[in-house]
Amino acid sequence: HVRRGQILSIAKLGDSEAEAIELIAEEGSEIVRKPLQKIRFPKKTILGAIIRNNTMLLPKGIEAINPGESVVVFTLPDDIERVQALFSKKK
């Protein structure tokens, strides 16, 4: 897979198909400044944490991600590109 710059790290979770991805939310992306409950994540994707000011937050539906914040997402390989698109600046 070719992965764009906003992915900081990616790790396979044990023997499962699932992967944990750390991404940065880019200014102008679909994900920033919207309540998480309004974001359409792929069906088998979970937003596990938001890293804000060097502190890990467990996200709630009313929470919004700010540009430049990193997040940890759990997803399946088939959904990585869609997840990445949510965090990438719209062209």
Residue ranges and their predicted role:
Residues H1-G28:
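Flexible, Lys/Arg-rich cytosolic regulatory linkers and terminal tails that connect or flank
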Residues E22-K89:
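Cytosolic Rossmann-like ligand/nucleotide-binding regulatory domains
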